[in-house]
Structure formats: structure tokens, C-alpha cells
Amino acid sequence: MFRSIEPAWNDQNLRELAGHISSHLFFAHIRAAIGSAVQQSNCHPFRHGRWLFMHNGFIDGFAAIKRDLVIAVNESLFPEIKGTADTEVLFYLALTFGLEDDPPDAVARAIGFVEARGRARGIQYPFQGTIATTDGESLWVFRYSSQGKSRSLFFTRDVRALRQEYPDREVLREVSDDTRLVVSEPVGDLPGAWVEMPEASYGVVSKEGDQLLPFVPKPPRKTR
């Protein structure tokens, strides 16, 4: 995993590494800090074992509910929290609620917990954003906000169908049939290449196939 506070488009170390790394799954995040300090420990993605987690958005009123959220993290996981970002706390809440066993359920319970604690403190819309998490084999992505106005999230259409529509596009000949991209905003200007994920939904990309399902936060189970 490579993390840096340097701008990705001007990071020579990243450029050098990218030319020598190959993988069946890449996880990348370029962000502008909102409220948290600009430091490497706050850079996405966050990792626990083989799990990676990143988030585009924010927990509204995080300073007011941070203590409530942090003390809900399982005591065996708590020492791993190194930074001050709301995303890292959300990640460890999801781990506490069973991310390694059932990612959709754990994320639903983590966000449900954030919303419950936020509303108890008078915060109308506690959560905003999109989430991506992976175990290195499969990818889970979520689009949800308390207000129902989430950050955008797009995924690519089937590569084989795109090849038939655009037989002269060299880039489509260079990728495999099972290639998928999930991004915050469309990359490039190829008409029909991108599909926007619906509001309040989650997707799964795995060897068994792709799924797109509704997402609803849940009341969390007891954490201890």
C-alpha cells in the first residue's frame, strides 16, 4: 500500500511504483482534506489485515459525536486507529460490526450507528458519501447519505458490449472481458461507457459476478 500527502498527479515516487506493479485489483483514492489534519495517517485507504476501506464524503458534526463513535469500537481494534479522520473511525466501526464476515450488513450497521448518535446530538443529516471496501478479492461499493443526496458513483458497462459498439477503440482491446472500474466521476468521454449507481444502493464486484442491491442502514448490534 502506498500513501502520501503529496498531490498524486505530481508524485514521482507514485509514478515510478506504478510502472512496476501489477494486480488483478487496484484501490486508489485522491482526496481533499475536510476538517482533519493533512498527514499520512489520515490518507486513504485505511487497512486492517487484508481489508482496505475508503470514503468520499463526511460525518457531519464529527467533533460532537467522535467520542461516542470511538468508544463503540471493539477494544481489540482500538489501538490500530492512528489518525484523526472520520473515515478511519467509520472503518473500525464497520470492522466492529462484522465487516470481515458480512460487509453489507456491517457497513449498514456502522452508518446506522453514526446516524443514531448524530441525531441524538441534534444533527439532522449525520452521514454523507460513498464507500469502497475490499478484501483483495472482491469489491463492495456503497452510495448513501442521510439527506438522500449522495456524492456520485459510477461503474463501467460490460466490456464486451462496449467493444461491439466501439470496435476502433484500442483501450477496449487492451483490457480483459471481466474488467470493471468503479469511480466517483466518469473517466474519459466515451458515450454509454458509464452507469451511475442509484441513490441508497450498494454493489458487489466478484469472481461470481456483479450485483447491485438496495442499501438501508440498520440498528447496530451490541458491540461488546
Model region roles, listed by residue range:
Residues 1-55, 59-224:
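Conserved short alpha-helical segments that host acidic/polar catalytic motifs at enzyme active sites
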